[in-house]
Amino acid sequence: MGLPTLVALDRGASVLATDYYEAALDFTRHNAGQNGLPEPETALLNWRAPDRDLKVFDLVFAADVLYEESSVRALADLVPSLLAPDGEALFADPGRRYEPLFRELMQENGFRFETEETTVEVDGLDRDVTVLVHRIRRR
């Protein structure tokens, strides 16, 4: 839980980790401490009803969040308001059903995609997982 947050902290970034569930944020803070990392700033965030006073960021990243249509639509509405004018979003997706819809909606909102495909070994699976990493920027 919160692996992208831990990697960003390890690389010295200032991080705001968000989730719908407080328990997920607790676990992210715990994992940071267990790995000798500073505690990240955290906030509850409901993609479907976000606080409109959210900060603007140079980088927004997410992993494996494109799993249902309503989430994809909410994220496509939310991400543009979170990004600074020259900011970028990085989304990692293991080929979820609604990934093409997210790409379409973001492109309709004036964003362009650069996508890299990578293969990841996952403990407990007898096959590798292909992950698409999308770098998303305004046109």
Language-model-derived ranges and their functions:
Residues 1-139:
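S-adenosylmethionine-dependent methyltransferases
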